[in-house]
Amino acid sequence: MLEGIFDINHIFDENGIKTLKRFGWDGSVAVQNHNEYSEEKINNAVEYGENCEFKVFSGLKLSTKNQNEMEKAVKKYRNKVDILLVEGGEIKINRRVLEMNDVDILSTPELNRMDNGLDHILARLGSTNRVAIELNFGNLLKSRNYDRSKILWAFQRNLKLAKKYDTPVVISSGANDIYGIKAPGDLRGFLNTITDPLYSKKIIETPSKIVDYRLYLKKDNVLTLGIEVVE
């Protein structure tokens, strides 16, 4: 059973990984964009983590507005990385992602939208298929004025839907370098301003549970969730 609190970011260098540990994280999901995927890059990050007793897992974000391309990319990369994210925004992409149990996280469902990107039907799909909704804290910080208030509103709306239908939620720093890294307490403190503290704790702990689930499914004797070959 994997335990601890993990950040989701784009940190691959040794200094960044040491900074994550110093800030209080137990592990990290280091996310690459699918058009820049490098096995060597993630292997180096994992090695840096091992050298300072810090868990680093591989993540990949798929970004496309074409549903067929997205589905092909999911099949291509699913077994190459630990955690698979798909960038949302387009409603057809949001829906299809939440229908796919091969995807772990729907990233930024509110991206470039005037609404929050989800409704009760999509929230139920995410709950059924164990697809988490991402709150990208880095995107919120980089936004300005009306865009920031719009993203914050989308966060609040999606949290209400996720809580009602038991849809997994993760919050990510989305950090690209040491200056974007946030301490776990900072992210939880932010969550406490838009939802209740117990739910904030659950959200902070969700990334490690997703990683643990994927590691379980990778075991040779596991056919699917709940079905194992016993010798």
UniProtKB/Swiss-Prot annotation:
EC assignment: 3.1.26.5
Catalytic EC class: hydrolase
Residue stretches spanning the membrane: none
UniProt catalytic activity: Endonucleolytic cleavage of RNA, removing 5'-extranucleotides from tRNA precursor
Cleaved signal peptide residues: none
GO process terms (BP): tRNA 5'-leader removal
Function: Part of ribonuclease P, a protein complex that generates mature tRNA molecules by cleaving their 5'-ends.
UniProt record similarity statement: Belongs to the eukaryotic/archaeal RNase P protein component 3 family.
Protein name in the entry: Ribonuclease P protein component 3
Gene name per UniProt: rnp3
